[in-house]
Amino acid sequence: MNGIIPLWKERGMTSHDCVYKLRKILHTKKVGHTGTLDPEVEGVLPICIGRATKLAEYVTDEGKVYVAEITLGKSTTTEDATGETVNTKELAEISAAELQAALTKLTGKITQIPPMFSAVKVNGKKLYEYARAGIEVERPSRQVDIYSLIRLDGDTALNQSNPTFQLEIACGKGTYIRTLAVMIGELLGYPAHMSKLERTRSGFFKKEDCLTLTEIDEMMQASDSSFLYPLEKGIESMAKLVIEEEVYAKVLNGGLLPTSLFAEVENEPRAALIFKDKLTAIYKPHPEKKDLWKPEKVIELNQA
C-alpha cells in the first residue's frame, strides 16, 4: 500500500496517535505524518503510506492555511486556551482599522520565537520538557512566511464584551499560530492568546478532501482503498522531468546523471523524475560536480 491520505485529525488526538491507529487500520508499519498538530487542534494532516513516506519532508514543506480564534485581554503559559493565565488587561475599544494595521504589519517575512510549550529542541531536549520542569531557556528565533491574514468575522470593533476575532492565516512551514496571536496582541498593546485553531489546508490537500479515522476504517473493511492519493500528489509544486527507459535504469541504481539532461529545470533546487506517469526519483544538483545531478530520493517501482 503506497500513497498519501488527507486525514482529518480530530481534537483530542496527537499526530502520533493518528499514525498508531492508521498502522492498525491499514495493517502496515510504513506510516508517517507530515508535521505535528497539537492535540487540541483539529484539521488537515496528510499521512504518507509505504513508499510515500520518502516524500513526507516535501509535503511538510508546503504552505498551510488555518482558521484561528484569537482572544485579547489575556495571555497564558502555553499561548493557547490550555495554559494557565499569566496576564490580564481590560480592553478599551479597538477599531477594525487598528486591528487591520496590526495584521498588515505581520504579513510577509516575520521573526518568531517558539513558545516554551513546543517540540522545538534546545540542547537535545524538547522545549516543553523544560517548561514542565519550570525551566525557561533561551529559544532560537526563526524567520517564517505569513502570506495573508484575513479577518473572517466582519469589521466590528473589539472591546471588553467582545474580545475575540476570527482570522484566516495562510503561512509557510514552521509558523506558530499561538505565537502569532501573542504578536498581534503586543502590537495592539494587550496580552493575547489563541483560543481555538483549525487547519483547513496543508499543501495540496483541503478540508473537503479529508476523511476521519473512522471513515478510513469503514472503507478498509469494505476493501475500498480509494482514500489513497498517488505519490505524485505530494510533489505537485516540484519541477518535473519525464525520462526514458535508458535513464530510468540508471535512476533505479541511484546513478548520477548529466546536467544536460536537466536543461529545462536547471534553475530549480530539485526535480521529480517521471517514468510512465509515475514518480521514480527526486534529483538535485551535485554539490561538488557541476556537470552532474545526484539522487536525493529514489522511489522503487513495481513495473508490470
From Swiss-Prot:
Molecular function terms in GO for this entry?
pseudouridine synthase activity; RNA binding; tRNA pseudouridine(55) synthase activity
Q: Which residues form the active site?
A: D38
Q: Which UniProt keywords apply?
A: Isomerase, tRNA processing
Which gene holds the coding sequence for this protein?
truB
Coiled-coil regions listed in the entry? none
Could you tell me the superkingdom of the organism this chain comes from?
Bacteria
What functional role does this protein have? Answer: Responsible for synthesis of pseudouridine from uracil-55 in the psi GC loop of transfer RNAs.
Q: Could you tell me what this protein is called?
A: tRNA pseudouridine synthase B
- Show the SUPFAM superfamilies listed in the entry: Pseudouridine synthase
A Pfam family annotated for this chain is TruB_C_2
Q: Which NCBIfam families match?
A: TruB
